[in-house]
Amino acid sequence: MSTFGGPGTAARDDLAQDFVAFAVEAGVLRFGEFKTKAGRLSPYFFNAGLFDDGAKLGRLAEFYARRMQASGLAFDMIFGPAYKGITLAAAVAIELARLGRNLPYAYNRKETKDHGEGGSLVGAKLHGRVVIIDDVISAGTSVRESVAMIRAAGAEPCGVAIALDRQERATETTQDGVRDADHSAVQFVQRELGLAVCAIATLSDLLQYLARQADPALAQHLPRVQAYRDRYGV
């Protein structure tokens, strides 16, 4: 189960299972050997940039909206950090409006504009309780920057909605070099920034999906994904 406040339990989460199946079918979630930003060799890779047509993006927005509505989190508007978060925020705002909840949204530019309306923020004025929407939380940098912008505008960041929680230990730099932390990037955001984190699905959900597969082409990946979780998971 993938809800606000934690990575979930072993109970089956139908929304998460449907999302994992969708991501696999869309080619967004792939299996093989992939090098992560932390330098680890991961047996799977999630690339939200491959939700690259109207149908895929619309369905992705449905998953976000359903998870957010079920979360119980109260929020007044949506914020999408540049760059991937911009499209996600717009798509989710459209889907929520379709479901009867019309909320404002905003996003930031990475380059401050010095003409026209100027500034780095675009869209509705930030106000009230703001939920941040992104694809994943890798190091928490984007979330920290978003929190600073939202607070500087006088609004309150209240949570982060993401597509996938990898549930793996973050890395941290010490005087002896880079080492694995005892927490994930999502846990850092929860503990240090005080924000609820909502994931449509988690690594636990992916493992459940693989364990249920009758297709050997998919089931064969379960041992490697489980071994990765055993080594780097939280």
From Swiss-Prot:
Top-level class of the enzyme under EC nomenclature: transferase
EC number: 2.4.2.10
SUPFAM superfamilies associated with the record: PRTase-like
Catalytic reactions on record: orotidine 5'-phosphate + diphosphate = orotate + 5-phospho-alpha-D-ribose 1-diphosphate
Its job: Catalyzes the transfer of a ribosyl phosphate group from 5-phosphoribose 1-diphosphate to orotate, leading to the formation of orotidine monophosphate (OMP).
Residues annotated for 5-phospho-alpha-D-ribose 1-diphosphate binding in this entry: 37, 83-84, 109-110, 113, 115, 134-142
GO CC, alphabetical: cytoplasm
Annotated metabolic or biological route of this protein: Pyrimidine metabolism; UMP biosynthesis via de novo pathway; UMP from orotate: step 1/2
Subunit structure: Homodimer.
HAMAP family: PyrE
Necessary cofactors: Mg(2+)
UniProt-listed InterPro entries: OPRT, Or_phspho_trans_dom, PRibTrfase_dom, PRTase-like
Binding residues annotated for orotate, in chain numbering: 45-46, 138, 166
Lineage, top ranks: Bacteria, Pseudomonadati, Pseudomonadota, Betaproteobacteria, Burkholderiales
A Pfam family that the UniProt record links to this protein: Pribosyltran
UniProtKB keywords: Glycosyltransferase, Magnesium, Pyrimidine biosynthesis, Transferase
Top-level taxon of origin: Bacteria
Protein name as catalogued: Orotate phosphoribosyltransferase
Single annotated GO MF: magnesium ion binding
Organism name: Methylibium petroleiphilum (strain ATCC BAA-1232 / LMG 22953 / PM1)
Family, similarity comment: Belongs to the purine/pyrimidine phosphoribosyltransferase family. PyrE subfamily.
Gene Ontology BP annotations: 'de novo' pyrimidine nucleobase biosynthetic process; 'de novo' UMP biosynthetic process; pyrimidine ribonucleoside biosynthetic process
